[in-house]
């Protein structure tokens, strides 16, 4: 099972404040553990929303772009991981070991399971499955 681990933004990450060397060292060590355990597929930190944009698609077909920053930090992300684990419980166990909290003293991490091809059932036709497998092969290099 694959999970996306979402590190929620706070006022410090949204202000562009960088973690200190101690936290970066701890996070690097934790990432090494994830990699050695075969758990980490990928992950990145994100710039503040002030450097981003949102694209809204309306029912009428219109497209509206809103540049950041965005006010509701509880809805924003500061980073993410993609992990391959056996269960949600295993993902939770790993999340409990994340070097936290960040600068603000509190942190929130969300765990979301990623859809796999089999999750789509009958709508995943052989043609769609072949397309998906081909795309994944190209992405894997």
What is each stretch, according to the model?
Residues 1-141:
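Conserved, structured core segments of small domains
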């Amino acid at each position: 099972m694959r999970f996306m681990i979402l590190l929620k933004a706070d006022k410090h990450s949204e202000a562009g404040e960088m973690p200190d060397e101690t936290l970066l060292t701890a996070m690097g060590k934790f990432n090494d553990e994830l990699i050695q355990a075969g758990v980490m597929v990928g992950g990145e930190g994100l710039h503040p929303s002030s450097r981003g944009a949102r694209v809204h698609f309306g029912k009428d077909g219109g497209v509206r772009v809103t540049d950041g920053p965005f006010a509701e930090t509880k809805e924003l992300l500061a980073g993410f991981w993609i992990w391959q684990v056996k269960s949600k419980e295993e993902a939770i166990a790993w999340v409990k070991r994340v070097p936290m909290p960040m600068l603000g003293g509190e942190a929130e991490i969300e765990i979301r399971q990623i859809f796999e091809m089999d999750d789509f059932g009958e709508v995943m036709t052989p043609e769609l499955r072949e397309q998906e497998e081909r795309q994944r092969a190209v992405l894997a290099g």
